Amino acid sequence: MLLAEEFAESALHRRVLFHAAAGRAGAEGGPSLPRLPCSGLDSAPSPRGPLPGHAPRRPPRPRTGRQVLGAPPLSEKCELPGQDSQKSSVPSHGPKTPSGQKVKAPHRPLSLSWKQDREQTLAAAYVPVVVDPRGQNPEKLRFNFYTSQYSNSLNPFYTLQKPTCGYLYRRDTDHTRKRFDVPPANLVLWRS
C-alpha cells in the first residue's frame, strides 16, 4: 500500500518530467507546449521564506522499492509531445455496427426470466410442510406446500412466504395496505 504522501510525490515527479520534456522540445526548435499550472510544483522559492507557523519544505525522500499497482489517474491530463489530443473523450460502450450505431444486447425482462427459472426448479421448489396435526390420523395428513425460494428467516413477518418487495420488487407495485371492509366517511355528516 502506497502512502498518500508518496503518491503525491510520484505525481509531482511525473509532472516535473513532463515539464522537462516540454522545455527540451521548445529548446530544440520543436513545437513548444504551453506550460500547465501544476499545483504541487514550486517554480521558484519564495524570497520571503516560509510563512510564519509553517515548516520549511523538506526535500523529497529517496524512493523505496514499493510499487503502485493500479494507481488512480491524475486529475489533469498531461500529454507528451507528439500525442494528439483529438481523441474522443466519450467512452463507447457496447459493440457497434458498420453504420456506427450501437447494438444493444438482448435482455430478458426480470419477470420472464424469473418465471422460467421457477418452472425449471418447480419440483425442488415445493416442499411439503406439516402444519400442527392436532391429533389427527397420520394417514389423513394434508400437506401444505409453499415455495422455498422465499426466506422464512423473518418469521413472523413473512408468514405467507410472500415478500412485500425485495425478491420480485416492481416499481409500479402499490404496497400500501387497503381496507375494503371500512366504508368511507361521509364528510357532509361529519361537518354538520
UniProtKB/Swiss-Prot annotation:
Which residues, by range, are in coiled-coil regions?
none
Cellular localisation: Cytoplasm, Cytoskeleton, Flagellum axoneme
Tissue expression pattern: Detected in the sperm flagellum (at protein level).
Q: Does the keyword Glycoprotein apply?
A: no
Keyword terms, alphabetized: Cell projection, Cilium, Cytoplasm, Cytoskeleton, Flagellum
Per its UniProt entry, which superkingdom is the organism in? Eukaryota
Q: Which Pfam families match?
A: CIMIP3
Residue ranges of the region described as Disordered = 24-108
- Compositional bias (Basic residues) spans? 55-64
Q: Does the keyword Cytoplasm apply?
A: yes
Principal localisation = cytoplasm
- Family label: Belongs to the CIMIP3-like family.
Q: Which PANTHER family match?
A: RIKEN CDNA 1700001C19 GENE
Q: What is this protein called?
A: Ciliary microtubule inner protein 3
